[in-house]
Curated annotation (Swiss-Prot):
Residues 1-33 are annotated as: Disordered. GO terms for cellular component: bacterial nucleoid; cytosol. SUPFAM superfamilies: YbaB-like. This is Nucleoid-associated protein SaurJH9_0500.
Length: 105
C-alpha cells in the first residue's frame, strides 16, 4: 500500500490539530473582552464565545429624555466587544489552520 504512511501521518496531524483547537476553544470561553462606547460611559464584556457576561452603564449616560442615545451606546459597545471576540478567535484558531484549505476557517 503506497502512500499509507502519508495518510497515517496526516491523520495524526489532524488529531493533534483538533486537540490544540479544543484547548484554544476552552481558553476562549474563559477570555473576557470589553467593548466601550461614549468615551467609556457604556462597557459591555463578552467571552471569547461571544456570550455577554457584563454590562456597565455610568450614571451620566442615563438621560430619561434621550433613551435612544443610551440604546445606541449599548449597541455600539456590544458590537465592538463582539468584533474584538471575532478577531481574537481568528487569531487564536487561525494559527492552527494555516496552510489548510478548510471552508469556514
Amino acid at each position: 500500500m503506497r502512500g499509507g504512511g502519508n495518510m497515517q501521518q496526516m491523520m495524526k496531524q489532524m488529531q493533534k490539530m483538533q486537540k490544540k483547537m479544543a484547548q484554544e476553544q476552552k481558553k476562549l470561553k474563559e477570555e473576557r473582552i470589553v467593548g466601550t462606547a461614549g468615551g467609556g460611559m457604556v462597557a459591555v464584556t463578552v467571552t471569547g464565545h461571544k456570550e455577554v457576561v457584563d454590562v456597565e452603564i455610568k450614571e451620566e449616560a442615563v438621560d430619561p429624555d434621550d433613551i435612544e442615545m443610551l440604546q445606541d451606546l449599548v449597541l455600539a459597545a456590544t458590537n465592538e466587544a463582539m468584533n474584538k471576540a471575532d478577531e481574537l478567535t481568528q487569531e487564536r484558531l487561525g494559527k492552527h489552520t494555516q496552510g489548510l484549505n478548510i471552508p469556514g476557517m
